[in-house]
Amino acid sequence: MKRFLLTITSALVLSAAMAFAADSEEGFVQIFDGKTFNGWKTATEHTNAWSIRDGALVAHGERCHIFYVGDPKPFKDFHLKVDVMTQPHSNGGIYFHTKYQSEGWPKGGFECQVNNTHSDWKKTGSLYDICNVAEPSSQDNKWWTQEIIVKGNNVTVKVDGKIVLSYNEPPGAQPGKDFERKIAEGTFAFQAHDPGSTIMYKNVRVKRL
């Protein structure tokens, strides 16, 4: 009887966990198919920095950004989830509220840092030069899920479900001269930072809020 009850309890726990996982992904849309660059456009510089391998966008090479162009409607309030893995000493980033730019570091929007062991002290989850995280919350050579949630004037960043940053943009904030870093609207982009960095991005999904 005890074994029977234990089996039922285990089944109920598993069922609840599966239901929670399904609910947590409800409303999300995949924006990278894992096979092609459909819906994505690279900058015009160093385009060979980008490839697709094992279902992931792979960034390795001189500076080049790849932008999501698959939806003409800009994203304002949203919840973005990306599975990320870095090799040691790599630097990269996930941009939001940005727009296509043919070369250079993107001026529009924010960069959410991807960096566990690169020499730059601003680590994974930082809103670059706005609200920085000094301690890494993820590890090289292991996949993690990086989430960016924008609602109103708040930006929340999670790594594997744990909040690593919550930023409230102050009233009257103005765009910067060189880099705007101002909550507005726009698209997403990933960064290939330098030849010494290798970063994989996959399972890219987003939900409008």
Predicted regions and their residues:
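Bacterial N-terminal signal peptides
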Residues: T7-A17
